[in-house]
From Swiss-Prot:
Transmembrane segments: none annotated. It comes from Burkholderia orbicola (strain MC0-3). The active site is at 359 (proton acceptor). UDP-N-acetyl-alpha-D-glucosamine binds at residues 6-9, 20, 71, 76-77, 98-100, 135, 150, 165, 223, 329, 347, 362, 373. It catalyses: alpha-D-glucosamine 1-phosphate + acetyl-CoA = N-acetyl-alpha-D-glucosamine 1-phosphate + CoA + H(+); N-acetyl-alpha-D-glucosamine 1-phosphate + UTP + H(+) = UDP-N-acetyl-alpha-D-glucosamine + diphosphate. This is Bifunctional protein GlmU. One of its GO terms (cellular component) is membrane.
Length: 453
């Protein structure tokens, strides 16, 4: 089977410099959703027709299995499909999809393909309560499809028809070439409509069959930011429903966004307003607090992530405790039972088993052993303005509050670092490290007093 995806439109109503098919739905371009669905049907040829912003669109979705045809002038859907003909296998049927219709299920498309076997012409239709703006399916007294009429060209009687054309078709490819060549642009838009091919198919004696999706939203397209927002909500609710079926507890299914792939174990609980981006894995018994953003991360079993935590490119072991208001940046690796608390930032660092950094700390480019306590206000000074250096803290170290570790530096096993210490040299095992300071008390000091107005 050939699959052609039309993605050449200008998308004027989007009011954006970004080509319409590249606007994101669930964090990925609209067109990428359509291509992924097309791939599940295992086509022999997959062709995307580009036009407006062609180079940008091609760069965004380029892949070994995707070919591109260019529609230099926007002369209608029939003209667009004609540009793809040289890339198609004439011996195989062709399925035509749209780059701005991202939610059509593969099962719906397969049903249409099956209905159109043996050289039939298949149309995906849907019956709407309000069909305004769509091409109507015109049938004869026996119920056979005779033609498709566009909204602007429809008679008052035809405008009453509720069954509409979605634009998605399956057609014999060899005949399609002839039919597209016979199209005329004698319509209100002066365009070559792909929908006019159905009349040519009927005239040629081909049987025209129809199929409908399980859900109306499968055929919804995007022509404005409002429609994009509507489809985003539909998609996210579908994702939430699937998570609920899999046993995930969602505090409010309407307030979770998955912009990638979220894999959950048993008894996972997710509070409101959480966003998951890229590839995220949550093992069994993970609890996510409200307003968290988690991107490209793996979270071990029994972990608790408290509210307002941001995690990006991190690996968390089992039974870790994160947040609230913590930030784990790319390269953060936490072993089992590690704690990273409020207003702690970890970047490109390993935190060992049972180690804790509970408050107001920056840990960057560091290797921290097991059972280490990092006091509040500790900073690893890893950057000299040109280069990054690592800090190594071995097992069972106690780091007092307000400590600075100037990398590159190593702190040996079992060291205790006094509060307010700056470490710029390696520290041997088991010692107390501190900066000698003299505390002075001055008598007779009078604190300034505000003047009364």
């Amino acid at each position: 089977m050939n699959i052609v995806i039309l993605a050449a439109g200008t998308g004027k109503r989007m009011r954006s410099a970004l080509p319409k098919v590249l606007h994101p739905l669930a964090g990925r371009p609209l067109l990428s959703h359509v291509i992924d669905t097309a791939r599940t049907l295992q086509p022999s040829r997959l062709v995307v027709v580009v036009g407006h912003g062609a180079e940008q669109v091609q760069a965004a979705v380029a892949a070994p299995d995707v070919q591109f045809a260019v529609q230099a002038e926007q002369l209608g859907t029939g003209h667009a499909v004609r540009q793809a003909l040289p890339l198609l296998d004439p011996a195989q049927p062709t399925l035509v999809l749209y780059g701005d219709v991202p939610l059509t299920r593969a099962s719906t498309l397969q049903r249409l393909v099956d209905a159109a076997r043996d050289g039939r012409y298949g149309i995906l239709t849907v019956t709407l309560d309000d069909p305004t703006g769509y091409g109507r399916i015109v049938r004869d007294a026996s119920g056979f499809v005779t033609r498709i009429v566009e909204q602007k060209d429809a008679s008052p009687e035809e405008l009453k028809i509720a069954e509409i054309n979605t634009g998605i078709i399956v057609t014999p490819t060899a005949q399609l070439s002839m039919w597209l060549g016979a199209l005329k642009n004698e319509n209100a838009q002066g365009e070559y409509y792909l929908t006019d091919v159905v009349e040519l198919a009927i005239e040629a004696g081909f049987e025209v069959v129809t199929s409908q999706p399980d859900e109306e939203w499968e055929t919804l397209g995007v022509n404005s930011k409002a429609q994009l927002a509507e489809l985003e909500r539909i998609h996210q609710r579908n994702v939430a429903d699937a998570l609920l079926v899999d046993g995930v507890t969602l505090a409010d299914p309407a307030r979770v966004d998955v912009r990638g792939t979220l894999r959950c174990g048993r008894d996972v609980s997710i509070d409101v307003n959480c966003v998951f981006e890229g590839n995220v894995t949550l093992a069994d018994n993970v609890t996510i607090g409200a307003n968290c953003v988690i991107r490209n991360a793996s979270v071990g079993a029994g972990t608790r992530i408290d509210a307002f935590t941001h995690i990006d490119g991190a690996e968390l072991g089992a039974n870790t405790v994160i947040g609230p208001y913590a930030r784990l940046r790319p390269g953060a690796q936490l072993a089992d039972e590690a704690h990273v608390g409020n207003f702690v930032e970890v970047k490109n660092a390993v935190i060992g088993h049972g180690s804790k950094a509970n408050h107001l700390t920056y840990i960057g480019d560091a290797d921290i052993g097991a059972r280490v306590n990092i006091g509040a206000g500790t900073i690893t000074c890893n950057y000299d303005g040109a280069n990054k250096f690592r800090t190594v803290i071995e097992d069972d170290v106690f780091v007092g509050s307000d400590t600075q570790l100037v990398a590159p530096v190593r702190v040996g096993r079992g060291v205790t670092i006094a509060a307010g210490t700056t470490i710029w040299k390696d520290v041997a095992e088991g010692v107390l490290a501190l900066n000698e300071k003299t505390q002075t008390a001055k008598s007779g000091y009078v604190r300034p007093v505000k003047k009364k107005s």
